[in-house]
Amino acid sequence: MITKELEQNMRKSVEAAQRNFNTIRTGRANTSLLDRLTVEYYGADTPLKSLATISTPDSQTISIQPFDLSSLVLIEKSIAMSDLGFTPNNDGKIIRINIPPLTEERRKEFCKLASKYAEEGKVALRNIRRDAIERIKKSEKESEISEDQSRDEQDNVQKLTDRFITEIEKNLSDKEQEILKV
């Protein structure tokens, strides 16, 4: 009945949680750390990746080469003012960010942040489940489907929810292992 749409919505919630996980630092240089960074460029907040080429020449360095050299200082300022905790090094053509090794305390903070993102994803899944079950009950109330069909549909919704929650928990476990690996 509504399984296809429901599955798509739940998949989007899992993907959103995964995107959040990708923004968490692990001690290795990763371009996704800068995915959410915006730069005020000609009066508009512009995503960094549309202003520069971002690469990782080695496991401890992120390199940012702007398409327009006049934006170099703006990019540097944006990185320095962000909550990422990076200190950009500007050599006039390229900005380099050295990724320091994580302290044990920072690793624990990042694990807590990952848990928070996972919980947000699970809450989103539960909200989608609640809405779907309400629609099923409404259909049953209006005699569009039988009580047995309603129960079967609700069971299917619950199984789908459980499957996606398990997927988020697995992604969280993988991310925590990645964060805690020294």
UniProtKB/Swiss-Prot annotation:
The keyword Cytoplasm is annotated on this UniProt entry: yes
SUPFAM superfamilies: Ribosome recycling factor, RRF
GO CC, any one term: cytoplasm
Region (Disordered): 137-158
Keywords, in A-Z order: Cytoplasm, Protein biosynthesis
CDD domains associated with the record: RRF (cd00520)
Family matches, as Gene3D superfamilies: 3.30.1360.40, Ribosome-recycling factor (1.10.132.20)
Pfam families: RRF
Keyword check for Cytoplasm: yes
GO terms, molecular function: ribosomal large subunit binding
Main localization, broad class: cytoplasm
Localisation: Cytoplasm
UniProt record, GO biological process: translational termination
Known role: Responsible for the release of ribosomes from messenger RNA at the termination of protein biosynthesis. May increase the efficiency of translation by recycling ribosomes from one round of translation to another.
Recorded family membership: Belongs to the RRF family.
Name this polypeptide is given: Ribosome-recycling factor
Organism expressing this protein natively: Prochlorococcus marinus (strain MIT 9211)
Taxonomic path: Bacteria, Bacillati, Cyanobacteriota, Cyanophyceae, Synechococcales
